[in-house]
Amino acid sequence: NGLAEHYLSKRIGVERVMGGFVNFGADWLGAGEILYGNRGAVVIGEVDGGIQMRTRAMQKLLQCFEPNVLVTDNIMGYLWGKMCYGAMLFATALTGESMAKNFADPSRISTFASIGKEVIATAVAEGVSPESFDGFQPLAFMPDSKPKDFERCMTELSEFNSKSAKSHSGIHRDL
């Protein structure tokens, strides 16, 4: 999680940096004990948007973990999408309820909308086109979005998270 790809590229060279995005659920429970909660998107891409032989080699390597790993020419779009989703997960951590229940609760919709719109507006200002994944729809957070788009996004995020053995975010766990 994060947006360190450009920073790292400037420090160590773009040829030594590849962006990666994961959205599977997992929690460290203790020494040698990890809960794998659910499958989710795994996406890799070059910082400059190209697709190289090493990108395909990394895809092949990662397919032993996630057969549907994607290669993208817009890794920053996925990372900014995850930044938006992650910001909303911080809000879910402030309740005692599951991620799925939070996203399904109509009384929390305005909070998620405000958080998401701020992150997506920042991404767009940075020249990034955020990407969709696992129920997250960045178009729902655009200034010209319709309420039904946002409601559909919340429903899909709730459904995605309801199937996970990991009911609460890592942020909730850490708090």
Where are these regions (language model features)?
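Rossmann-like NAD(P)(H) cofactor-binding subdomain of soluble oxidoreductases
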Residues: 1-33
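A broad, low-specificity signal for short, low-complexity segments enriched in glycine/proline
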Residues: 3-9, 46-48, 147
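Hydrophobic alpha-helical segments typical of transmembrane helices
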Residues: 4, 54, 170-171
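Internal alpha-helical scaffold of NAD(P)-dependent oxidoreductase catalytic cores
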Residues: 11-16, 29, 35-136
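Short, functional N-terminal and low-complexity linear motifs
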Residues: 23-28, 82-89, 137-140, 152-158
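NAD(P)-dependent Rossmann-like dehydrogenase/reductase catalytic/cofactor-binding core
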Residues: 113-175
